Amino acid sequence: MTEHLVDLAVIGAGPAGLAAALAAAEAGVRVAVVDAGVRPGGQFWRSPAPGAGPFRPATLHHGWHWFTSTDDRLTELAGTGRVLRLAGHHVWSVQAAGDQWAVHCVLGAEPRQHGTSAPVTVHARRLVLATGAYDRQLPFPGWDLPGVITAGGAQALLKGNLVVAGQRVIVAGTGPFLLPVADGLARHGARVAAVIEANSPLGFARFPGAVLGATGKLGEATGYAGRLLRHRVAVHHRHVVLGALGTDRLTGVLVGRLDRNGRVRAGTERQIDCDVLAVGWGFTPQLELPLQLGCATHLDVDKSLVVTVDDDQATSVAGVWAAGEATGVGGADLATVEGRIAGLAAAASLGADAVADGRPLRRRRSSLRGFASAMHQVYPIPDIVLERCSDETLVCRCEEVDAGSIRRAVVDLGATEARTVKLLARPGMGWCQGRVCGFATACLTARHTGRAVAEPDLRAFADRSIATPVPLGRLAAPLADEQPDGDGG
């Protein structure tokens, strides 16, 4: 086993994690940045492997200059010993070890290919959790057909492999994220047949203060809309995908227009041909590690389970801070601000002398959080999506559990919350452990019991004692109890 001793461990190297690490390191704290990716940037600044082909980052990435300058500075600090960068390290458990935290990692495929296979434990006096989020998916007829992918998956293929997902693509769901996905596909050769948006941006008229506090967001959206117009991509607001069509693979989608009550208008259903459907209903915060540590949570405006933090981004667990999507989905700009606040607060708790004034950051965070709250209210998931789930609609792909099995677990077997439904019908018990079907199962359970979705429903699919797949041999080996004297193996 390889062990490292640092002042602060930052888990996650996306926008929030990079900002936290740099803020703390520049304040004089020795920092370890631990991330599952082999290159920094997280999902937002995902980049292709070296040699993958010609690559112009500015065409795919927003805020690329900030990322590269931050990454360069962290590399410079790593050369001085102030920063330890652990890429390709999957954190599967975090445990209290006296007055420190033991961050247990297993290595991904790329480090193993270079001859490094020993497990790694990072001992740190403080933690910043910047674990990010993943695509939120909802079931609908035909969503398990080959050719139906997540909106984030389509973007990941483009950013990480320079691969366009299909020839004729429809981007659907709700939220501003659909625009950069469609824009990226169109700019790199795909024929984007349509963007099917369940809501309308006119809803921002109800939140003038939030829009004025984040004018950059408005300009960003206007830029995407202008480029889509130049590529002749039609954006259909207040429309939803009612079903994916095809036998062996996707051949088209059935869409319909929603009225002001969120119902499908009679006579508006029509078919659009496509070979790929990229669907996105927002994001689900990745909370395995915060829940493992016992951090308090609450439901956010978008019905996500998120970590509760104070003004310093501190969680309910002493010595642990959280930043970014784990504390509420709000985009990369908000994540970087929260990450910097968390990094500075963690550094101050360690006695760092040169901690910057955080008041401007807090004002910026307040504005961005206001915009995020407005965004979630403008782009809610329409009730009609889950209402149209017939008993035959597959919900859990891993265990092949349909919507009827979930309904019967509640109506016939008496389940009153999602954990019991999980035990009775087995949704979320397969390979993905509920990462794909968990939110939908929680919502369907709440619907059948006649109530709103609650924290316990969502915790049932995120509360895991092991945060990521780990070899059985690692579980069989004892964890290191002794604390190392310093960095080393």
Residue spans of the language-model regions?
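Residues forming the flavin
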Residues: 2-425, 429-431, 435-489
